[in-house]
């Protein structure tokens, strides 16, 4: 598997993977995946914050640049996948879940 969807990621045990955000500093300053390690692609192997014993989920803006990075890391012997649709997919999922929570709260309030 060279890529993973948000839904597939949610099925993994939380401590079994680490998200690596390869976007640049400007993109990350506008928002980032909670708990992700920000790292330039060329520094992943040498970054002490990267837990190479875990599945590495590589995240870029749209899931395009992360594919090549994940493939290169796999060739180096690491368990690495690209996050399909990247940060945008993560953000859309967060927004959807927030809307669901808001909807549930509104229903609960309306039933009182």
PLM features per residue range, with description:
Residues 59:
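Short, surface-exposed ligand- or partner-binding patches at beta-edge/loop junctions that are enriched
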């Amino acid at each position: 598997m060279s890529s993973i969807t948000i839904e597939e990621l949610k099925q993994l045990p939380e401590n079994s993977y680490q998200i690596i955000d390869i976007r640049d500093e400007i993109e990350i300053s506008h928002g980032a995946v909670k708990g992700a390690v920000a790292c330039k692609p060329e520094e992943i192997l040498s970054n002490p914050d990267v837990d190479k014993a875990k599945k590495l989920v590589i995240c870029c803006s749209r899931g395009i640049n992360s594919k090549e990075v994940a493939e290169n890391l796999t060739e180096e012997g690491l368990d690495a996948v690209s996050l399909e649709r990247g940060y945008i997919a993560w953000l859309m999922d967060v927004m959807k879940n927030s809307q669901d929570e808001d909807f549930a709260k509104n229903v609960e309030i309306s039933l009182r």
